[in-house]
Each structure stands twice: as C-alpha cells, then as structure tokens.
C-alpha cells in the first residue's frame, strides 16, 4: 500500500472537485483486471492477505476464461499535491456482446484509460471501445501494459497508439499490471487529466444505473452514478422507465466490499439496495430519481437490450425440464438481457427458446446452466430473427426454423452487421476470401501502423453466428480479432431446408439458409445423419427438401440376414424363392417401421462432431 492513500474521504460529504470517475477499456486479455488488482493494492482498499488475482471478477467462469462479464465499481483514496482525492474505477466487460453495458459504464465516467498490451498492439475491441469513449466525450489516457514481457515492443506500439488518438509517443504511459511499475504515475495522471464530475447539487436527484447484480441474501444490488442532487438511506426512489417506486434500505460505496454510507452526492459512484428480487426492476441505463421530488427528464441513452441470437435449450433427460425452468428464472435475476419462452420439439421434447445478445452470451449462459445447476443440455444451432412477408402481406417474425411459413413468400429480411476485423497485413487476402464466402460486402480498409490492417465489411448476422469466428481464427493463425455492431436489415434470398427421415420431417434439423448454400447444407446434413443413425432392418432414405422439392438424398442400407446360409448347393429357384420372400418382408417392414433417432445422433449432428466440422 502506498502512503499516499492514507486519508479516505467520506462519501456524501466529498466535494465533487475531489472526485475522479474513470474506467479501463481494453481488448480481451490485455490485462485490465490485473491492472485493476494493482490499483486496489496500491491504494490499500484490499489488504495484502485478501488479495487474489482478478479480484473484481467474482464468477468462476470470469476467472477461468479470463474475461469480465459484469461491471464492477470501486472507490479508492489517492493523494496528489497535498490534496486527497476519491477515485472511482469502473471495471467494464471487454466483449462485443456486452457493448451496451460498456456504453452505460462509460456514460458514468469522465475519463477512460485505454489499455493496450505492449506485446500485441491495438486489437478490434480496443478500437470499438475507444470509439465508444470518444462518442461519450471522455478524456482518454493511453497506456501500454505488460512492459515487463520479454516480447514487449513498447516503442513501436506507443507510436501506433499516439498515431491513433493524436499526441506524442512520449505521452503514452508504460505500466506493468503484474509488477506494479508505473501504476503510481498512472493514478497521478488520472487526477491531473480527467475532469471532475459536474452536476447540480440542489437539483432533483438523478442517478444512472450502470449495472445491477443479484445477491442471494439481499436481493438486487444496483450500481449507480449520481448525476444531480443526492440520495440518502430510507428515501423513496422511482425508476423513470417503469415508474416503479422503492425504498432505499441501504446506500453506500464499494471499496470493493460494500460499505454503507450516509448517502451519495453529485458525481459519486455507489450502490443502493431496495430489497427488490428481480434485476428487471432496475434496468441498466435507467434513471433513478427521488419519489418525493422527481426529476422531469430522464438521463439520455437508455435502450432495452435486444436479443440478437436465438437457440433452443433442451434437457437431455426430459424430467429435468422443471429444473431448467427454475435455473433460467434464477439466471434471469442477474442477467436482464436473457429472454426465453417454452417450446416443444417432436424430436427433442420440452425445452426453451432463448434469446441472447450474441454467441459469447449464449456460451456463458449454457456453461453456467451446466456448472451452477448441474444440467445436461442440448443446444440447437443458433439462429437469428428473420422478418418473412407472405404473399398476402402478412409479416411473420421467425426466430426458429419451425415457425417459417409454408406457401408462397414475397420476401425475407435478415439482420446485418458492420464487422471490423483487425489483423496483420499478410492475412488480408485470406480474410477477404472468408468474408466474401459469407456474403459480405466490402466497405473499406485502413492501415494502422506499418503491419496492421482494419478491414470493414457488412455481413449477414446469420453467417457470423455459426462458425465464422473459428474459421477466422484458424485461417489467420489466431491473429485476427473481430468486432461487430448491428446495422439494420436487408432483403435476402433465403429458404428453409427440411430434413426428412423416411418421408417424415425432423424439426430439430431444419435450417434457414441462403438459396445458394441450401444444396451444400442438405448434402452435408444427410451425409452426417447417414453416419450417425444406426442401420435398421429395412432401408431408410434421408432426404433434404426445400418445400416439396428434394435436393439431396442418402440411403441407410438395410441390415439383412443371410437367408441362403442353409442352402447347400441346390436349385437356383429355391434360392430365388427365399430372397423374394425376404424382399417382401422388408417391404412390409418399411411400410410400418419407424426410425428412432438416438439422442447421441442429435447431439453430434447439431454440434458438427462428425468427421470434418462443416457449417451447421
């Protein structure tokens, strides 16, 4: 602990001029949680013996994957030039799925530390978050992290960073989150450069929610940044988007463990607990005001998080359905962006259709379901929202291939995204080829420094949600990084491909694909199922169809008994009679026989774990 962090300012009595609100923005794995750890240690808010790596990442998944999913806010004391300041650090998620959370966290700050790995340089997410910070008019402090690494090249990347945000390479701070080198200077720079918060102390209270976390003992803990006025304990508050009123049971600051205080005043960042049990009651981005003297206008920038990717979740054991419902209800308490509704599938039984912010969100939810609740699940291939207009001008929103209308269709619209890919210049050709193959439209490219390129495309979201990211990583030796943002909708020539087993449709394998790729999807799925479904006593045709037109077919050969084994030599007519009789029997079986698709075949076919991984 530094001796400069001895005097702690009292919340609610702090002059706004002595407050600094800042966040750290960086690409995944550039070390922002480690830098946050060092700051907590140097300012003494976490004792040496309590310290653990990634102190602010509370979930096991966050610590294992090394990613931050939920924002955290910490108040730290720091002395500079004889004055003592209160620094509020807001730790933000770095992943593209959580861009809305990041934008709200940025709106709660006046400055941002732009952290870049000195061995890796600028990546896609760094740029995306930098643009968000500049949109919010934040003061940006450029910092190179991990300078203790043998592979670090601080001079090269300092020049790159200075070129990106304007300024001299000498202005770029060099720190090491691991060893703590340069962190004191960084805290000084925060005090010097980041402006103090501005707000009207005597106006009606307005606070912006930038995160809310569910605590199993105390209900929802809402993290807020006070913009105007003040709030105190036992005061009645109102949420401006839902008009719901609650009583504040406890209000305080987290440093980093929650510490109750007499209230929060202008510019301060803290938490409030109202005893509400559902996170949807305190929405990220909403404005909190006093119920007795409410503010007139809410703070700008609030939007409802919209799910982008849909997937079906089914328990492998049908009797786990009530547990799955309960688990989703519990996750919903801490994750307001998750939406789900029950659905049934002929093949997979009862389950839920869930909407997610993106693929990482989907992965994290399924991992938490299996880890925290011990559920074994099948997830169907992810799909996006399509707007289908039928011939009689009805517009149908399709989130699941089984909802796709039969009959004549006038047009189909699909969501598109603007994708930015950053990679070394040697991989430009490979990346462009990959994007073109996914129906991408080239927007432009820029060189950032001598050897890094940013390539911009608009692409259908449906093409990204499958295995685009895996292919991008494997074709660029892991160097490329991707960032995307929604960019509206476009009309597309899409069709629904059904898979028929012995003439009967299996709904779990249906998919909405582009007409050009329908044949490839049909042959791949039919071939995959031929390998997975066990042979029956009779021949089973597997067909892929668009409407009534069959586009691909595979046969599973029948298992046949050797009926001629008992004939030693003898007349050909005798043998023929036995073979004809067998043929008749197989024909009869085929009329009445049903094909059971084993559970393993479903899981393998949907996850693509047969031979070479194809497009799902």
UniProtKB/Swiss-Prot annotation:
PROSITE patterns: G_TR_1 (PS00301), G_TR_2 (PS51722). Signal peptide: none annotated. One of its GO terms (cellular component) is plasma membrane. CDD domains: EF4_II (cd03699), EF4_III (cd16260), LepA (cd01890), lepA_C (cd03709). GO terms for biological process: positive regulation of translation. Its main location: membrane. It comes from the Bacteria. Its EC number is 3.6.5.n1. InterPro entries: EF-4, EFG_III/V, EFG_V-like, G_TR_CS, LepA_C_sf, LepA_CTD, LepA_IV, P-loop_NTPase. Pfam families: EFG_C, GTP_EFTU, LepA_C. Keywords: Cell membrane, GTP-binding, Hydrolase, Membrane, Nucleotide-binding, Protein biosynthesis. GTP binds at residues 29-34, 145-148. Gene3D superfamilies: 3.30.70.240, Elongation factor 4, C-terminal domain (3.30.70.2570), Elongation Factor G (Translational Gtpase), domain 3 (3.30.70.870), P-loop containing nucleotide triphosphate hydrolases (3.40.50.300), Translation factors (2.40.30.10). It is found in: Cell membrane. It catalyses: GTP + H2O = GDP + phosphate + H(+). One of its GO terms (molecular function) is translation elongation factor activity. Residues 17-198 form the tr-type G domain. It is a peripheral membrane protein. Required for accurate and efficient protein synthesis under certain stress conditions. May act as a fidelity factor of the translation reaction, by catalyzing a one-codon backward translocation of tRNAs on improperly translocated ribosomes. Back-translocation proceeds from a post-translocation (POST) complex to a pre-translocation (PRE) complex, thus giving elongation factor G a second chance to translocate the tRNAs correctly. Binds to ribosomes in a GTP-dependent manner. Belongs to the TRAFAC class translation factor GTPase superfamily. Classic translation factor GTPase family. LepA subfamily. This is Elongation factor 4.
């Amino acid at each position: 602990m530094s001796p400069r962090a001895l005097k702690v300012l009292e919340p609610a009595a702090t002059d706004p001029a002595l407050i600094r609100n800042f966040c750290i923005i960086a690409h995944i794995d550039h070390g922002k949680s480690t830098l946050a750890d060092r700051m907590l240690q140097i300012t003494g808010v976490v004792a040496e013996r309590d310290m653990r790596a990634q102190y602010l990442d509370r979930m096991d998944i966050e610590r294992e994957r090394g990613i931050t999913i939920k924002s955290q806010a910490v108040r730290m004391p720091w002395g500079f030039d004889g004055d003592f300041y209160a620094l509020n650090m807001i730790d933000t998620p770095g992943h593209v799925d959580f861009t809305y959370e990041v934008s709200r966290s940025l709106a709660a700050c006046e400055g941002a530390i732009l952290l870049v790995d000195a061995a890796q340089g600028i990546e896609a997410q760094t740029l995306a978050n930098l643009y968000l910070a500049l949109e919010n008019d934040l003061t940006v402090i450029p910092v190179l992290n991990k300078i203790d690494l043998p592979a670090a090249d601080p001079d090269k990347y300092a020049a790159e960073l200075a070129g990106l945000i304007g300024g001299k390479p000498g202005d770029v701070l060099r720190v090491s989150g691991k060893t703590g080198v340069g962190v004191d200077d960084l805290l000084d720079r925060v005090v010097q450069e980041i402006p103090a918060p501005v707000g009207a102390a005597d106006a009606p209270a307005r606070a912006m929610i930038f995160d809310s976390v569910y605590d199993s003992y105390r209900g929802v803990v809402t993290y807020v940044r006070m913009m105007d006025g003040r709030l105190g304990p036992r005061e009645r508050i109102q949420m401006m988007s839902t008009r719901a009123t609650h009583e504040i049971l406890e209000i305080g600051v987290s440093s980093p463990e929650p510490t109750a205080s007499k209230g929060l005043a202008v510019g301060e960042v803290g938490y409030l607990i109202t005893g509400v049990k559902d996170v949807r009651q305190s929405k990220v981005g909403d404005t909190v005001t006093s119920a007795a003297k409410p503010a007139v206008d809410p703070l700008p920038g609030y939007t409802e998080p919209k799910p982008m990717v849909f997937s079906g979740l089914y328990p492998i054991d049908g009797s786990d359905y009530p547990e799955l419902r309960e688990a989703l209800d519990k996750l919903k308490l801490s994750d307001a962006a998750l939406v789900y509704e029950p659905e049934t599938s002929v093949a997979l039984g009862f389950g839920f259709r869930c909407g997610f912010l993106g693929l990482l969100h989907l992965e994290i939810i399924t991992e938490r379901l299996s880890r925290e609740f011990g559920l074994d699940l099948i997830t169907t291939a992810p799909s996006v929202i399509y707007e289908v207009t039928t011939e009689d001008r009805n517009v149908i929103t399709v989130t699941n291939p089984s909802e796709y209308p039969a009959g004549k269709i006038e047009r189909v619209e699909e969501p598109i995204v603007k994708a930015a890919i950053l990679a070394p210049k040697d991989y430009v050709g490979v990346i462009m080829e990959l994007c073109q193959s996914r129906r991408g439209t080239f927007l432009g490219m820029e060189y950032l420094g001598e050897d890094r390129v940013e390539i911009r495309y608009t692409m259908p979201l449906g093409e990204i949600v499958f295995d685009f990211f895996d292919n991008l990583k494997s074709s660029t030796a892991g160097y490329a990084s991707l960032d995307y943002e929604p960019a509206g909708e476009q009309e597309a020539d899409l069709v629904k491909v059904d898979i028929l087993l012995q003439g009967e449709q299996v709904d779990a394998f249906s998919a909405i694909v582009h007409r050009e790729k329908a044949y490839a999807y049909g042959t791949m799925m039919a071939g995959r199922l031929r390998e997975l479904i066990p042979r029956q006593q009779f021949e089973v045709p597997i067909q892929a169809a668009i409407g009534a037109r069959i586009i691909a077919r595979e046969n599973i050969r029948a298992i046949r008994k050797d009926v001629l084994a008992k004939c030693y030599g003898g007349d050909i007519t005798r043998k023929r009679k036995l073979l004809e009789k067998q043929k008749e029997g197989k024909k009869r079986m085929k009329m009445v026989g049903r094909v059971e698709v084993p559970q393993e075949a479903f899981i393998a076919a949907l996850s693509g774990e047969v031979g070479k991984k194809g497009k799902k």
